Amino acid sequence: MESIGIVAPQTMHFAEPLRLQSGSVIGNYQLVVETYGELNAARSNAVLVCHALNASHHVAGVYADDPRSTGWWDNMVGPGKPLDTNRFFVIGVNNLGSCFGSTGPMSIDPSSGKPYGARFPVVTVEDWVHAQARVADAFGIERFAAVMGGSLGGMQALAWSLMYPERVAHCIDIASTPKLSAQNIAFNEVARSAILSDPDFHGGDYYAHGVKPKRGLRVARMIGHITYLSDDDMAEKFGRALRRADGALDAYNFSFDVEFEVESYLRYQGDKFADYFDANTYLLITRALDYFDPAKAFDGNLTAALAHTQAKYLIASFSTDWRFAPARSREIVKALLDNKRTVSYAEIDAPHGHDAFLLDDARYHNLLRAYYERIANEVGA
């Protein structure tokens, strides 16, 4: 299928202050956005794609100055792809607090003339949705044909259908959960502890010291990657294969250097992540994950929390995803059915664990393609 080709981000500036769930206020902030396809005259074919932890506004296509900069969901979004940009106008937004151009910890705090660092206020999924709604307003979009996301992006899609029910026709929530389990919060805490205990963290003001807490970021990313893959997938990819620096494949080195393929993979992913991601942003986003719990205000009753939704839903999960297991998606499905909402649900038998939502699986893509065909017929796209 054809790639969407060369794309370019745009920066949108917002002068109206944004009051956060914590009570803090962000004023004069900016959000980086990318769009693909054309908005129709009725402004009825817009789809918002919400990103997960380490992703960004760059959903699809490549940048002219970097042919390797393929968007994180390029296999899903583009001409002739499941989310077909010949029919839909697709928006990707880099969330507030991120490190890819939107206002966040790396931005200059106008009150001090220095980067916010750890002083940047804690943000929530709900804060992101309110900020994204202002992006929609700027484009003149009153109602999205769909809001879609996987993992943390799926939480944002679900939050959209709760917070702006009249502005979402379809909610597409993939490999997600209505709230984090204690185990998931624990994984996030271990990752944050690795960053906070790095001597280069400097209380979050490492920018002034010209350093980055890379050791902590590496460990945080390694922990994350373990949870994104299934046991079977790791066994197939790595098994107990050795990878020694001296090239030997059949003997132990009796040291603590890298010896196993899986060790090499985790260190590579950790190093790569630490080079491009910001530690303060990692802390913020994992805390936003922890806090997401729309049923909390309803004494834990998810059915009550979803009572005022109006959208139609596609909920999808993956059989080997143990980070956000299929049972968590089924909780959402049950609550929606209890409210007599229109719900399509699929549990896809895929070996790749949580990361399966990012991969080009024919059954998964055919599901999304068919669902978007239905949406296209509804909006005349």
Swiss-Prot record:
Which cysteine pairs are joined by S-S bonds? none
Identify which residues the record assigns to the active site.
Answer: S151, D321, H354
**Which pathway, metabolic or otherwise, does it act in?**
Amino-acid biosynthesis; L-methionine biosynthesis via de novo pathway; O-succinyl-L-homoserine from L-homoserine: step 1/1
Q: List keywords of the entry alphabetically.
A: Acyltransferase, Amino-acid biosynthesis, Cytoplasm, Methionine biosynthesis, Transferase
Quote the InterPro entries the UniProt record gives: AB_hydrolase_1 (IPR000073), AB_hydrolase_fold (IPR029058), HAT_MetX-like (IPR008220)
Which residue intervals define the domain AB hydrolase-1 in the entry?
A: 45-360
Q: Which compartments does it reside in? A: Cytoplasm
Question: Where does it primarily localize?
Answer: cytoplasm
Q: Which Pfam families match?
A: Abhydrolase_1 (PF00561)
Please give one Gene Ontology molecular function term for this protein.
Answer: homoserine O-acetyltransferase activity
Residues holding substrate = R221, D355
- Gene3D superfamilies, per this entry? 1.10.1740.110, alpha/beta hydrolase
Gene Ontology CC: one annotated term:
cytoplasm
Q: Which SUPFAM superfamilies match?
A: alpha/beta-Hydrolases
Q: Where is this site: Important for acyl-CoA specificity?
A: R323
Enzyme Commission code: 2.3.1.46
Name the GO terms of the biological process aspect.
Answer: homoserine metabolic process; methionine biosynthetic process
Reaction catalyzed? L-homoserine + succinyl-CoA = O-succinyl-L-homoserine + CoA
Enzyme class, first EC level, given as a word: transferase
As for family, the record states:
Belongs to the AB hydrolase superfamily. MetX family.
Question: What does the annotation say about its assembly with partners?
Answer: Homodimer.
Q: What does this protein do?
A: Transfers a succinyl group from succinyl-CoA to L-homoserine, forming succinyl-L-homoserine.
Read off the NCBIfam families from this record: homoserO_Ac_trn, PRK00175.1
Q: What is this protein called?
A: Homoserine O-succinyltransferase
